[in-house]
Amino acid sequence: IFDEKSADGIVGAVDLEQYDYRKGSGSAVRATEATVAERIPPRLKVRRGAPLELPHIMILIDDPQKTVIEKVSAKKASLKKLYDFTLMKNGGSIKGYLMDGETVAETDSALAALGNSEEFEKKYGKGTPVLLYAMGDGNHSLATAKEYYEELKRENPDKDFSNHPARYALA
């Protein structure tokens, strides 16, 4: 939902195991434009020493039936409000709500349906890999997060990274 006065969305974690920014990628999470590899090393240098990372990543979904974001937005009144404040410099205001277990399950189910390969192929052609999450903004930030995560795995081959915080990026 977007107009001049409001924009609804979902803040969540992206599994970097599902992301590939390289040209020709068929991963479920991928870039919509070329990633300039030369931009990654300077960002990676900053990321290595950062006590906190606050990325600006916007991911888009193709959801013409409005089964994901709009369904969550319709439930706002029943969700716990986490924050509600005015932004500086006439930036408007922002509110955030905590999705309850039922809403998370419904959202996961709706996203899984969007990732159905048969439905995706009907729309985009046979053999087209499902693009569930398209990078809208912050592609280089996400690519840097991916490189940092891959670097950690290379440096610690015996470590279990299945639940490591570096495996996920805020988007």
Predicted regions and their residues:
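A structural signal for short, well-ordered beta-strand segments and their strand-loop junctions
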Residues: 58-60, 134-136, 170
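Short, well-ordered loop/turn elements at secondary-structure boundaries
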Residues: 52-55, 127-131, 164-167
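Active-site beta-strand/loop microenvironment that shapes enzyme catalytic pockets
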Residues: 113-155
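Short, contiguous, pocket-lining structural segments
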Residues: 51, 99, 103, 133-140
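A short alpha->loop->secondary-structure connector
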Residues: 77, 153-161
